[in-house]
């Protein structure tokens, strides 16, 4: 865990790797939940810093000058690659996903045997995974302190700029 297989560097906390030939849904979910907790800490901290710097350098001074009472501050969050995560977890849960590793034991690919429900097709099985993912991650966000006690909100967008991020990280 926490290893960037494309650049071959440890980029997050080291975690015991999954060593089985096939991905086990319960094992993956347990590790994935831990990683979401770790990521929520970093994500909220970075967004807090961004909001602080906006205030420090008067990024929104003109807009805020128009508000003459207590303003409702929001804290916008999102999940890049949401549909891909849902499809990946669905494949692990409903099909068989063989983990292909290189000579050093690093995952380099996956081989899916069988079919699985995909996100966006009105299949309640995929929708259940999507609902769990969004609720779980957003609950983790809400449990953290936000700058100026702003209220977290979230959106799930499928935008093409996220493709570039995935290519850079091997996703």
Could you describe each region identified by the protein language model?
Residues 71-171:
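Ordered core of a single globular domain
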């Amino acid at each position: 865990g926490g290893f960037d297989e494309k650049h071959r560097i440890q980029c997050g906390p080291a975690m015991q790797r999954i060593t089985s030939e096939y991905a086990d849904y319960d094992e993956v979910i347990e590790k994935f939940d831990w990683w979401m907790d770790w990521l929520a800490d970093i994500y909220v901290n970075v967004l807090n810093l961004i909001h602080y710097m906006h205030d420090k350098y008067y990024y929104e001074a003109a807009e805020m000058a128009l508000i003459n009472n207590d303003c409702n501050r929001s804290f916008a969050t999102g999940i890049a690659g949401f549909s891909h995560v849902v499809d990946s977890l669905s494949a692990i849960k409903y099909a068989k996903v063989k983990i292909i590793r290189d000579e050093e034991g690093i995952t380099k690919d996956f081989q899916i045997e069988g079919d699985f429900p995909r996100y966006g097709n009105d299949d309640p099985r995929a929708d259940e995974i999507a609902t769990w993912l969004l609720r779980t991650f957003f609950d983790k966000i809400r449990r953290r302190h936000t700058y100026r006690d702003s209220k977290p909100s979230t959106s799930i967008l499928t935008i093409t700029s996220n493709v570039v991020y995935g290519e850079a990280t091997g996703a």
